[in-house]
């Protein structure tokens, strides 16, 4: 749709970027409006949904989306464990949304669930929790990882990764319900998920943490950095600051969730040192050769990312105070 509207705009002499921006804003507002009015109920016969840890931010988001879709939702928090068996006795689905470092422990503590109950977790690591759910429950099991923060406002175009545990035919409707909310689904095995998250989350968050720590130790003047920054540096600085506005326990859990993450970070540290050696030696040609090697590895993605980032930078610059 966007491509055809851009073509029409260009034919009429109207800036295509302007039309695309207006259409995207309309689409965002449409999803936001649905967030207020509600969504279609794909499984009206579903018994109550229990969210374990529903008082947390992601748990509250799923409670909201499920309630807007017409489902009855119950919350099971830490102080409710003495009533846990009663709360889940007739549950049609149980969603575990607790900190990573206690996810497997909480799954293991769950009382027996109805045999047809769908057991779901929302942790950002998948293999351990998925195995824990398969061991704790004989019924349908599904691993989810929402690839966005609970402050997103809307699930429109957000990615939700899913890992099959058991009996996918029983939870297929829930995946479709998530699509009704506007999200995009991506299926992957739990092992592959965790391997990729080592790069997407653990390494990236650690590098951001280290950069923020360096800025703080150097005691730079943030106001001056912002006043002097280019759009791309301002955006990068915003991403660093965003990390430190969130829960440190969450990021400690993500980064330290496996020995594999530590090994990857150590390899990154080693390559950082190798790059510094190029500077110490003043070897510009070696630097350029390494640069070209990485450019070749990125291939067509380099140009694609440049185009995408150009749009983001324009938007960031437009929003500059």
Name each model feature, range by range.
Residues 226-301:
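Interdomain hinge/lid region at the active-site interface
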Residues 49-53:
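Conserved N-terminal Rossmann-fold NAD(P)-binding element of oxidoreductases
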Residues 1-12, 24, 28-30:
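Long amphipathic alpha-helical segments
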Residues 57-58:
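Hydrophobic/small residue at the entry helix of a nucleotide-binding pocket
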Residues 27-47, 82-85:
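A short, basic/flexible loop-to-alpha-helix module at the beginning of a structural domain
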Residues 125-188, 194-197:
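Rossmann-fold dinucleotide-binding core
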Residues 158, 172, 193-245:
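Active-site-proximal catalytic alpha-helix in oxidoreductases
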Residues 85-133:
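Rossmann-fold NAD(P) dinucleotide-binding segment
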């Amino acid at each position: 749709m966007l491509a055809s509207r851009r073509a029409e705009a260009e034919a009429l002499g109207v800036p295509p970027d302007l039309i695309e921006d207006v259409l995207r804003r309309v689409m965002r507002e449409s999803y936001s409006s649905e967030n207020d009015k509600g969504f279609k109920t794909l499984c009206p016969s579903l018994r109550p949904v229990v969210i374990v840890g529903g008082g947390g931010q992601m748990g509250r988001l799923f409670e909201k989306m499920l309630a807007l879709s017409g489902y009855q939702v119950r919350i099971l928090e830490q102080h409710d464990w003495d009533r846990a068996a009663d709360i889940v006795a007739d549950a049609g689905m149980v969603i575990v949304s607790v900190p990573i470092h206690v996810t497997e422990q909480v799954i293991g503590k769950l009382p027996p669930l109805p045999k047809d109950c769908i057991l779901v977790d929302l942790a950002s690591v998948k293999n351990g929790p998925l195995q824990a759910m398969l061991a704790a429950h004989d019924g349908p099991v599904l691993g989810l990882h929402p690839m966005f923060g609970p402050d997103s406002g809307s699930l429109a175009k957000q990615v939700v990764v899913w890992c099959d545990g058991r009996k996918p035919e029983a939870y297929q409707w829930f995946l479709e319900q998530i699509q009704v909310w506007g999200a995009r689904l991506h299926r992957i095995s739990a092992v592959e998920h965790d391997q990729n998250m080592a790069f997407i989350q653990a390494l990236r968050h650690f590098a951001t943490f280290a950069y923020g720590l360096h800025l703080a130790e150097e005691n730079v003047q943030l106001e001056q950095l912002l006043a002097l920054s280019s759009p791309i540096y301002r955006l990068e600085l915003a991403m660093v600051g965003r990390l430190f506005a969130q829960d440190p326990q969450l990021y400690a859990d993500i980064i330290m969730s496996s020995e594999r993450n530590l090994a990857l970070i150590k390899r990154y540290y080693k390559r950082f040192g190798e790059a510094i050696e190029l500077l110490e030696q003043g070897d510009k040609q070696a630097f350029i050769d390494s640069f070209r090697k990485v450019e070749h590895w990125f291939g067509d993605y380099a140009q694609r990312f440049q185009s995408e980032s150009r749009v983001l930078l324009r938007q960031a610059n437009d929003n500059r105070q």
